[in-house]
């Protein structure tokens, strides 16, 4: 079962191309996380971890919530150029 993606940030102010790429990237993360076995040591490190990824000039901070099978994007900021 694939992880669902939830954005706790407003993506509307982001240009359409970057917004599309952000959604696509986070969905890819959700798809990959769904393939990790429940017995993997990866999950014990995810309990309190914040992760980040940079996409087209934007930094996203997210959590993996295995009990809910969710990826939650909790922060978004423009990177300085």
Residue positions per predicted region:
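A short, surface-exposed loop/turn module that caps and links secondary-structure elements
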Residues: 28-54
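Enriched for short, Lys/Arg-rich terminal
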Residues: 1-5, 16-20, 24, 50-81
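Short amphipathic alpha-helical/adjacent loop interface patches that line ligand
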Residues: 11, 15, 26, 30
């Amino acid at each position: 079962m694939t992880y669902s993606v939830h954005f706790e940030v407003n993506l509307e102010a982001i240009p359409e191309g970057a917004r599309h790429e952000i959604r696509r990237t986070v969905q890819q993360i959700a798809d990959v996380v769904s393939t990790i076995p429940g017995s993997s040591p990866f999950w014990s490190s995810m309990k309190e971890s914040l992760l980040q990824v940079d996409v087209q000039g934007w930094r996203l901070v997210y959590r993996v919530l295995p009990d809910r099978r969710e990826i939650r994007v909790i922060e978004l900021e423009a990177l300085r150029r």
